Design a protein with these regions (language model features):
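PRPP-associated nucleotide enzymes
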Residues: 1-143
Length: 143
C-alpha cells in the first residue's frame, strides 16, 4: 500500500460506512495499526470523538503471542454505554485482535461495528466495512 492508495482506501471505506446509514458516536482505533485509518475516517465521517485501545498480538513479521492482550488504559464503559462504536484497524489478519476488542464492547455499548482496510479469508471475524480482501502480506507505508 502506498500513501496515495491509503487516501483512496480511507475515502472509499468512509463512503461505505456513510452509505450504510451507520452513524458512529465514536471511532475507536486499535493501536498502532488502526491509528491513521481511524483518524482519516474521523475526518471523513465528521466524528470528533476518537478513542484508542492498545492490543498486543504481533511481535514481528508473522510472529505473534498465543492470544492478543488488551493493554491499559481502556475506555470507560460507563461513559460509553449509549454510544455507537466503530472499531478501526488496518487489517483483519487472524481477526483475533478485532475479536477481543469487539467482545470487550459487545453488550456494553449501544452498537459496535468494525472497519478495516484489508481483511484476510482466514479471519475469525467478518468486518462490516472492508476496503479490500487479500491473503497476501501487506506492507503499509507507516510500518
Amino acid at each position: 500500500m502506498t500513501w496515495d492508495s491509503f487516501g483512496v482506501a480511507s475515502r472509499e471505506l468512509a463512503t461505505s460506512v456513510a452509505d450504510s446509514g451507520y452513524e458512529p458516536d465514536i471511532i475507536l482505533a486499535i493501536a498502532r495499526g488502526g491509528l491513521l485509518a481511524a483518524g482519516a475516517l474521523g475526518y471523513a465521517l465528521a466524528v470528533k470523538n476518537l478513542y484508542t485501545m492498545n492490543v498486543e498480538f504481533y511481535t514481528g513479521v508473522d510472529e505473534r503471542l498465543p492470544v492478543p492482550m488488551i493493554l491499559p488504559p481502556v475506555p470507560d464503559l460507563v461513559e460509553l454505554r449509549f454510544a455507537r462504536v466503530l472499531i478501526v484497524d488496518d487489517v483483519a489478519d487472524t481477526g483475533h485482535t478485532l475479536k477481543i476488542v469487539e467482545d470487550f464492547f459487545r453488550g456494553r455499548v449501544k452498537e459496535v461495528r468494525s472497519a478495516v482496510l484489508y481483511e484476510k479469508s482466514h479471519s475469525v471475524v467478518q468486518c462490516q466495512y472492508v476496503w479490500k480482501h487479500t491473503d497476501l502480506w501487506i506492507n503499509f507505508p507507516w510500518s
